[in-house]
Structures are given as structure tokens and as C-alpha cells.
Swiss-Prot record:
Membrane topology listed for this record: Peripheral membrane protein
Assigned GO CC terms: apical plasma membrane; caveola; cell surface; external side of plasma membrane; extracellular region; extracellular space; lysosome; melanosome
Gene: Ctsb
Family: Belongs to the peptidase C1 family.
Protein name as annotated: Cathepsin B
Catalytic residues (UniProt): C108, H278, N298
Length: 339
């Protein structure tokens, strides 16, 4: 099934060379191989002593899943800049710069969604509402329309759930921020860290429609709703226009094992096997050394990649990065009475 969903650009990169290392994808051999290529990015060690089966489970997005209605294009009406970073454009919205950690769970589909929702609530209230939308609430309570929790899910289902049922607030693990903070602890899939070791993907926590002790607002009253949710066409300009006008979006792409070693530069697939589908948050774009890129936030903590972020080739639907864009607009009228 995966192969039918992998863009031609990735397949060509996968099959074009015969001298690629056949060793473990996290090995020094693989890292050295990538760094000896005349490519656009640098590899390094992000993971240490971690099973490949665990890493595959981190890629918990089902590509080619249910579709949301596609919004009407408007890029022709906008003069788009050569580069754009939502962190700078909306500096009064702290969630845009935040990197979360999905822990031992294939919940990337939920994280990409709630991160972008949090950003958009702040953006569309002109910085007046800063909230961390709860990944816990979405992961545990969305049910079958979103997929199978920690075993993988659909970004489109996440955004649809936001508009229909709403989501409460909730910060990262053990933060005691919001109604339902994340209950799956971060684990040490990186190098020389202090967190407990990753032992494999855990079960999806139970849906709990009650805020944690000490939070003053009820679960029902804490809900944040989307007004509308939609997909964005795979047009580079339309994706840029959507981010420029409304804020970061959720995207998904096919992950190959070389991506696990990304440290800096503009990622282009060079070597390795398919790991799975992975959802992320796209917050900007630019050009580095003549190579156009998307600026992306991952959910593997700040010690992965470039402080938790990465850049990936833009404009060629590389590894499907432009073909699974979803987003939505928050229901802002629910907030105006509070100001």
C-alpha cells in the first residue's frame, strides 16, 4: 500500500543509486554516506540504541485517508514574500515556536493538528487568546473517525473533530497546564539524554472528560471549537498563501529512514527504506543556498534535528509533503465576550 502513495521524486531517489549502505539506518555508515554526497543537508545522530520498529511506530499517520473539502484558492490575490516565518510574523503567539514530544505513541497526526490549532486561535484573536490545545483530548476522545489513537490516525479527522466536538486545553507532559495535559511521558530516543529509555509504543490512554484536579474550568466549558476545516490543494502557492493569511498548517509526508538522521539544511531523500507516514506542522518557507524549502516543526522534542525543526524541499511535492495539507479557522466569537 505504501508504495502506491509514494511520489515519483522519492522513488527515483530511492532507486537511482546502487552503492548506498545496506547497514542499519541509524549507523555511522549511513550518516557518513549522506554527508559525503553533494546534497542539501547534513546528517547526524539523533537516535541511539532504539529499535527500528519503535521508530516506524512514531510515524503514525495514515496517508491517503479521508478527505476534507478543498478550500477555494486565493493565492493570486496575495503578493507572497520570498521567505516567511510565522514565529516572526506573529511573535505574540508563543505556541508557534513551541516543540512538543509525542512520546512512545504514533500520535503525530494529533500533534500536528493541535499545534496548528493553537497557533491559529492566537493569530485569529490578535494575540488575545494564547492556549495550548490538548493533544490528549484529541488522541483519546476522537475515536474511530480519527483512526486508532497511538496506532495511527488521520489529520483530516482531527480537524473535523475540532469543528464538531471541540477540544479542551492541555499542555505537555507533567506541565499541569490547561484542562488535560498530555499523559504519555517523553522518552529518551535521543543521544545522552536524561529521560527514561523508549521501550516501544504504548496503549492509547482512556478518554477522560474531566479536567485534572486543580483546574478551575469544567471540561465542557473549556472547549475550543473550529468554525471550519478544509484541505488545501497541492499547489505550492496556495499552501504559502494559506500560511501567510491564516497561520501554520498541518501536513504529512512519507518518511524514509535517512530522515531520522536530519540535523540541518534542506532535507531531500537520499537513502533508506520507507518508515511510514508522518504528520507535522508547516510554519513558513524560504530559500537556502538556492534551494527552496518549507520550514517545519516536528514532534520529537527539541533535541531532534535543528532544535526540533527541519527544512524540506519545497515546490516538488517531495515525499508527498504538499499533497496532504489540512487546516481550519477557529470559532473566534466564543472568545469575544471574555475581553
Amino acid at each position: 500500500m505504501w508504495w502506491s502513495l509514494i511520489p515519483l521524486s522519492c522513488l527515483l531517489a530511492l532507486t537511482s543509486a546502487h552503492d548506498k549502505p545496506s547497514s542499519h539506518p541509524l549507523s555511522d555508515d549511513m550518516i557518513n554516506y549522506i554527508n559525503k554526497q553533494n546534497t542539501t543537508w547534513q546528517a547526524g545522530r539523533n537516535f541511539y540504541n532504539v529499535d527500528i520498529s519503535y521508530l516506524k511506530k512514531l510515524c503514525g499517520t495514515v496517508l491517503g485517508g479521508p478527505n476534507l473539502p478543498e478550500r477555494v484558492g486565493f493565492s493570486e490575490d496575495i503578493n507572497l514574500p520570498e521567505s516567511f516565518d510565522a514565529r516572526e510574523q506573529w511573535s505574540n503567539c508563543p505556541t508557534i515556536a513551541q516543540i512538543r514530544d509525542q512520546g512512545s505513541c504514533g500520535s503525530c497526526w494529533a500533534f500536528g493538528a493541535v499545534e496548528a490549532m493553537s497557533d491559529r486561535i492566537c493569530i485569529h484573536t490578535n494575540g488575545r487568546v494564547n492556549v495550548e490545545v490538548s493533544a490528549e483530548d484529541l488522541l483519546t476522545c476522537c475515536g474511530i473517525q480519527c483512526g486508532d489513537g497511538c496506532n495511527g490516525g488521520y489529520p483530516s479527522g482531527a480537524w473535523n473533530f475540532w469543528t464538531r466536538k471541540g477540544l479542551v486545553s492541555g499542555g505537555v507532559y507533567n506541565s499541569h497546564i490547561g484542562c488535560l495535559p498530555y499523559t504519555i511521558p517523553p522518552c529518551e530516543h535521543h543521544v545522552n539524554g536524561s529521560r527514561p529509555p523508549c521501550t516501544g509504543e504504548g496503549d492509547t490512554p482512556k478518554c477522560n472528560k474531566m479536567c485534572e484536579a486543580g483546574y478551575s474550568t469544567s471540561y465542557k466549558e473549556d472547549k475550543h471549537y473550529g468554525y471550519t476545516s478544509y484541505s488545501v490543494s497541492d499547489s505550492e502557492k496556495e499552501i504559502m498563501a494559506e500560511i501567510y493569511k491564516n497561520g501554520p498548517v498541518e501536513g504529512a509526508f512519507t518518511v524514509f529512514s535517512d530522515f531520522l538522521t536530519y540535523k540541518s539544511g534542506v532535507y531531500k531523500h537520499e537513502a533508506g527504506d520507507v518508515m511510514g507516514g508522518h504528520a507535522i506542522r508547516i510554519l513558513g518557507w524560504g530559500i537556502e543556498n538556492g534551494v527552496p524549502y518549507w520550514l517545519v516543526a516536528n514532534s520529537w522534542n527539541v533535541d531532534w534535528g535543528d532544535n526540533g525543526f527541519f527544512k524540506i524541499l519545497r515546490g516538488e511535492n517531495h515525499c508527498g509533503i504538499e499533497s496532504e495539507i489540512v487546516a481550519g479557522i477557529p470559532r473566534t466569537q466564543q472568545y469575544w465576550g471574555r475581553f
